[in-house]
UniProtKB/Swiss-Prot annotation:
Monoubiquitinated by the UBE2B-RAD18 complex on Lys-164. Monoubiquitination at Lys-164 also takes place in undamaged proliferating cells, and is mediated by the DCX(DTL) complex, leading to enhance PCNA-dependent translesion DNA synthesis. This protein is an auxiliary protein of DNA polymerase delta and is involved in the control of eukaryotic DNA replication by increasing the polymerase's processibility during elongation of the leading strand. It comes from Anguilla japonica. This is Proliferating cell nuclear antigen. InterPro entries: DNA_clamp_sf (IPR046938), Pr_cel_nuc_antig (IPR000730), Pr_cel_nuc_antig_C (IPR022649), Pr_cel_nuc_antig_CS (IPR022659), Pr_cel_nuc_antig_N (IPR022648). One of its GO terms (cellular component) is PCNA-p21 complex. Residues 61-80 bind DNA. The keyword Glycoprotein does not apply. Its main location: nucleus. Homotrimer. Forms a complex with activator 1 heteropentamer in the presence of ATP. Component of the replisome complex. HAMAP family: DNApol_clamp_arch (MF_00317). One of its GO terms (molecular function) is DNA polymerase processivity factor activity.
Length: 260
């Protein structure tokens, strides 16, 4: 038996919004330590990794490990039936072919009960090696989303150049070129508004903007985003999920010739 209750149910709604446009179906691995998901997108260009720790839920029970094959589109549709203030409970029997979703209003006056059919998914787990990164940039997530959206008007790829004093986002296309430079902030009242850069060596890499725009669907989950970069290995875009875990997106850099 698996049962997880989340008083702040809107977090789960935001998680689905962050995933569903990139991956259509995925295996939710449920264990006593929490819920995790790892999946390549349908074109096998990017990878998503989600962790929701059990201690972040208001109550959590998992008697044995389960692999729940979920259509993210279906789950997103069902979660749209939950109000933003609703308490959400997920429940599955040990060998169930459905996942129950229960939505309760805070005053308990309305309880909605949905059952979603599960899928049989054949999923390969990819090992994600722990890496030391040449450059780690932490910045407001809304600012990152805005930069990706703005530069998408100019070109379909962005060059991210990271140096000690700041990070530059550059795009070029038929219209011309665009550059956005963010300097490391020295004194900011709100930590969430700060731009911080930890750099071992300068990095300059090119990434497809359409994928970065998919990743920014996770912006409502966190006020900050962390970009971790090193030459020739995938960029990691990480959004923390308050007291619960994170969603990480991995995207391999484009090779220079492709970026023109």
């Amino acid at each position: 038996m698996f049962e997880a209750r989340l008083v702040q149910g809107s977090i789960l709604k935001k998680v689905l919004e962050a995933l569903k446009d990139l991956i259509t179906e995925a295996c939710w691995d449920v264990s006593s330590s929490g819920i995790s998901l790892q999946s390549m997108d349908s074109s096998h260009v990017s990878l998503v990794q989600l962790t929701l720790r059990s201690d972040g839920f208001d109550s959590y029970r998992c008697d044995r490990n389960l692999a729940l094959g979920v259509s993210l589109n279906s789950m997103s549709k069902m979660l749209k039936c939950a109000g933003n203030e609703d308490i959400i409970t997920l429940r599955a029997e040990d060998n169930a072919d459905t996942l129950a979703l229960v939505f309760e209003t805070l005053n308990q006056e309305k309880v909605s009960d949905y059952e979603m059919k599960l899928m049989d998914l054949d999923v390969e787990q990819l090992g994600i090696p722990e890496q030391e990164y040449s450059c780690v940039v932490k910045m407001p997530s809304g600012e990152f989303a805005r930069i990706c959206r703005d530069l998408s008007q100019i070109g379909d790829a962005v060059m991210i150049s990271c140096a000690k004093d700041g990070v530059m986002f550059s795009a070029s296309g038929e219209l011309g070129t665009g550059n956005v430079k963010l300097s490391q902030t020295s004194n900011v009242d709100e930590e969430d508004d700060a731009v911080t850069i930890e750099m071992n060596e300068p990095v300059q890499l090119i990434f497809a903007l359409n994928y970065l725009n998919f990743f920014t669907k996770a912006t409502p989950l966190s006020k900050t985003v962390t970009l971790s970069m090193s030459a020739d290995i995938p960029l990691v875009v990480e959004y923390k999920i308050a007291d619960m875990g994170h969603v990480k997106y991995y995207l391999a850099p484009k090779i220079d010739e492709e970026a023109s």
